[in-house]
A protein has these predicted regions:
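Short active-site oxyanion
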Residues: 2-6, 25, 42-44, 144
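Hydrophobic/anchoring residues in structured secondary elements
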Residues: 9, 123-126, 168-171
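Beta-loop-alpha module in the N-terminal Rossmann-like domain of NAD(P)-dependent dehydrogenases
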Residues: 23-86
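Rossmann-like dinucleotide-binding domain that binds NAD(P)(H)
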Residues: 5, 134-187
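A contiguous active-site-proximal alpha/beta segment in oxidoreductase catalytic domains
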Residues: 51, 74-135
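N-terminal Rossmann-like dinucleotide-binding module
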Residues: 1-23
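Structural signature of beta-strand start/N-cap positions in the alpha/beta core
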Residues: 3-4, 40-43, 66, 92-93, ...
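Structural detector of well-ordered beta-strand residues that form the stable sheet scaffold
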Residues: 29, 68, 93-95, 125, ...
Length: 187
């Protein structure tokens, strides 16, 4: 059983606050520090932009909070390693939001692979498309489509391979809808 006690959002507005209170959230704040200092809170869900993930993971781990964080942890491998190490050193659980592993359709494919029903995996080919382009403001802080969304495909490839290490990755992409995405340096 989970109780959401506090939601922190630096962009909190009256409408969002009203909605959260209607959902039973006791506290709303613009400052994440309020959550980290609350000893009654055991775990945090970090669903901010990618450029803040490692910072919040480190702060939450140091505050003794278990962590579920949206992917990816960071675009900088050094910061990723620091965040993971900080969580390990603090003895808190850290889970990254690779939600496709828990989707029943993807899980069905995994189960068929593991049972041998569809044979031995030799190659995995994944095609992905988002239903709509992200807002350009998000593209600028998310790391772009490869960091933000294609990471799911890489995770699924490793998951479906059942422990076998990936030996080669080929990726291609292009901007077909909103030229501003390409101008922001994505794809």
């Amino acid at each position: 059983e989970v109780e959401i006690k506090t939601v922190a959002d630096p962009f909190m507005n009256e409408e969002t606050e009203k909605f959260l209170r209607k959902c039973g959230v006791q506290n709303v704040t613009k400052d994440a520090e309020d959550i980290l200092q609350d000893e009654e809170i055991d775990a945090v869900l970090i669903c901010s932009s990618t450029d803040t993930h490692s910072k919040y993971i480190i702060e939450a781990a140091r505050a003794g909070k278990h962590i579920f964080c949206e992917k990816p942890i960071d675009y900088d491998l050094g910061k990723v390693r620091e965040a993971i190490q900080t969580a390990e050193d603090a003895g808190v659980k850290l889970q990254i939001g690779f939600c496709r592993r828990f989707d029943h359709n993807h899980r069905g494919v995994y189960d068929m692979v593991q049972s041998g029903r569809i044979g031995k995996v030799q190659m995995i080919k994944i095609s992905s498309r988002d239903p709509e382009p992200p807002a350009i403001e998000y593209v600028k802080v998310s790391g772009g489509i490869f960091y933000d969304m294609m990471i799911h495909d890489f995770d699924m490839a490793r998951f479906l391979a059942g422990g076998a290490e990936v030996t080669e990755v080929v990726a291609a992409g292009s901007v077909l809808i909103d030229p501003a995405i390409g101008e922001a340096g994505d794809v």
